[in-house]
Amino acid sequence: MRAALLEGANPFTVEDVTLLPTGPGEVLIRTEAAFACVTDVIQRRSGGSIPGPHIRGHAGVGEVVEIGEGVERARVGDRVVVATRPECGECFYCDHGQPQQCASAEQPGPDVAVRADGTRLRASARVGAYAEYMKVPAATIVPIESDLGGDVLSTLGCGVSAGLGAALNVADIAPGTTVAVLGAGVFGLSIVQGARLAGAGRIVVVEPLAERRELALRLGATDTIDPGTDAPIEAVRDLTEGRGADTAFEAVGDPAAMRTAF
């Protein structure tokens, strides 16, 4: 199959590689679409955290073409969303209700393919969506029935699920409270929708781009702030009779935005 490989801070290379056999608990998926995440840009610029060449892409959508021994959550022919690395379910954090801190998250997964020169390849987040096929743990997939295109559904595996999860599972937003979201990209807009589902009374989005502010309002924000014309902290206080936000989300990845959120 063809796959996009990354090694250190070098440019991506697209090469022919050979998949290793599908093992117990694994699923082989023909890739329909992959989600391009800013994480891939960061990994490329920083030299990456995975030693040696590997297949990038940690979320996607596709069709199941083969299932390994013991797999029950999918059948051949199913259309599935592939999410990023699953939690192990066994470490200290998983046992104490914090699967987002799973100790296995930073551990390299098993080899999934072999390069023409014999080099064995791992997959980013045990997914490797920048390839014609993905060989992934069954716990990573979610069968889905939808008429939406793969370009939309692939975002569910990372950007959308990360934003919704932050709002619904991590922040524990109380109904009627005020939420501030810094940044209205895919993560921020997903947080907005999660905050709305959680019953937040006021959802304030800080975003410099007018079109994103408009989209945030359509998706559930009650107020928007342009940081180019208004000071975000003071503006949020003005909207809340001086109280400020009960919960703040930083969805930009910028140090200045992080300081503002705190």
Predicted regions and their residues:
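Short N-terminal strand-loop motif that marks the start
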Residues: 1-61, 128, 132-136
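Nucleotide donor/acceptor-binding cores
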Residues: 1, 78, 176-177, 201
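N-terminal Rossmann-fold NAD(P) dinucleotide-binding loop
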Residues: 188-189
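Adenosine-nucleotide cofactor-binding segment
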Residues: 178-184, 194-260
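NAD(P)H dinucleotide-binding glycine-rich loop of Rossmann-like/cofactor-binding domains
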Residues: 30, 88-182
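Glycine-rich beta-strand-centered segment in the early N-terminal region that forms part
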Residues: 20-34, 47-95, 100, 145-148
